[in-house]
């Protein structure tokens, strides 16, 4: 009985050791990158970089700028897209769930891991179709800068003239 208790304690201590978790996370992470718009249906929405626009404690909207120095650096951690906002907290890409029958929804960069299901293919960053992802959308919106949205794939949306469908290309920083 004492042997079993000792082994259980040993396994728990090893499993809780942060050294093992850090190594596992690092092996699943990609090189750092910026997300840059391409193939926009409106030319003025090409070559823009995603950055976190602060909207409240722990909350940011994903907006866009032509200034690469303002761009937020991202990386893929498994199937989570996370951002390095120079804080001790993880910041995750978070496409907001469809709750209001909208044809497109905002994308946020919030404290935490964010949504899972992201991957990179030949057209750039994608999200899970099972979550309703139908592509990326950029609109001139209320922050005084273009804002990033995702298209809800189960509708045939009609976008305002200030919006463009785009791809989010991955531009590695190192």
Identify what each model region corresponds to.
Residues 1-25:
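Fungal secretory targeting signals
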Residues 53-100:
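Short, well-structured hydrophobic secondary-structure segments
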Residues 8-11, 73-74, 117-118, 136:
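Short glycine-aromatic motifs
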Residues 1-2, 18, 31, 57, ...:
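Short non-domain terminal segments
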């Amino acid at each position: 009985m004492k042997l079993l208790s000792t082994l259980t304690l040993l396994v728990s201590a090893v499993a809780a050791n942060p050294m093992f978790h850090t190594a596992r996370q690092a092996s699943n992470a990609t090189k750092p990158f910026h997300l840059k718009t391409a193939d926009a249906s409106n030319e003025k929405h090409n070559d823009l970089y995603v950055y976190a626009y602060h909207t409240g404690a722990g909350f940011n909207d994903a907006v866009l700028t032509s200034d690469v120095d303002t761009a937020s650096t991202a990386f893929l951690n498994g199937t989570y897209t996370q951002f390095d906002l120079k804080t001790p907290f993880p910041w995750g890409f978070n496409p907001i769930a469809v709750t209001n029958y909208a044809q497109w929804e905002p994308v946020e960069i919030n404290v935490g891991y964010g949504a899972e299901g992201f991957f990179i293919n030949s057209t750039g960053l994608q999200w899970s179709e099972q979550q309703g992802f139908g592509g990326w959308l950029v609109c001139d919106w209320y922050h005084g800068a273009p804002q990033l949205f995702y298209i809800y794939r189960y509708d045939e949306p009609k976008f305002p003239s200030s919006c463009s469908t785009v791809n989010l290309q991955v531009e590695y920083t190192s």
